[in-house]
């Protein structure tokens, strides 16, 4: 397994729409494993393939404290959503920035697992929020898209400043 490079906003590759996975095979499983490795290395709880410049409908999630409840969503479909909630979300592609994002409280999804077996999942709370956040990535949407243009511009400026400082340090 290897750690992949995470794309950072405003990289336009984050806006690409992911294609459905045609066949879950060894190559897809390797991508899934590398995505988990990357997510854990970056201390995240979810990662969409788009964020590592793989434009296929693959999501990995693990919201557990012990990093032992891996969830793989290949070609996820939202079947139902209900209620309203929201938390201050962060994103590995938008480092050190957080914002309140409105989300459905409960979701029901259908997807394929790491072995290509179909399953349905009904959930709420942090897992439901994380699923919605990662599914947004698959259609080129970021949490900053839910913000006002002014807030979005401020975040972009902060990230550009951070990138310049990091470039100088290296």
From Swiss-Prot:
This is Peptide deformylase. Gene3D superfamilies: Peptide deformylase. Belongs to the polypeptide deformylase family. It catalyses: N-terminal N-formyl-L-methionyl-[peptide] + H2O = N-terminal L-methionyl-[peptide] + formate. The active site is at residue 134. It comes from Yersinia pestis. InterPro entries: Peptide_deformylase, Peptide_deformylase_sf. Its cofactor is Fe(2+). Keywords: Hydrolase, Iron, Metal-binding, Protein biosynthesis. The lineage of its organism: Bacteria, Pseudomonadati, Pseudomonadota, Gammaproteobacteria, Enterobacterales.
């Amino acid at each position: 397994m290897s750690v992949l490079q995470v794309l950072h906003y405003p990289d336009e590759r984050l806006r690409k729409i992911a294609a459905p996975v045609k066949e879950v095979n060894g190559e897809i499983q390797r991508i899934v494993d590398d995505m988990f490795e990357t997510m854990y290395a970056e201390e995240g709880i979810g990662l969409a393939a788009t964020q590592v410049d793989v434009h296929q409908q693959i999501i990995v999630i693990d919201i557990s404290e012990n990093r032992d409840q891996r969830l793989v969503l290949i070609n996820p479909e939202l079947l139902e959503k209900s209620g309203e909630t929201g938390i201050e979300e962060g994103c590995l592609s938008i480092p050190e920035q957080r914002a309140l994002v409105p989300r459905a409280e409960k979701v029901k999804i259908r997807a394929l697992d790491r072995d290509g077996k179909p399953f349905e999942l009904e959930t709420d709370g942090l897992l439901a929020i994380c699923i919605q956040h990662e599914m947004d990535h698959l259609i080129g949407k970021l949490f900053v898209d839910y913000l006002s243009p002014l807030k979005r511009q401020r975040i972009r400026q902060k990230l550009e400043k951070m990138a310049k400082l990091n470039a100088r340090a290296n």
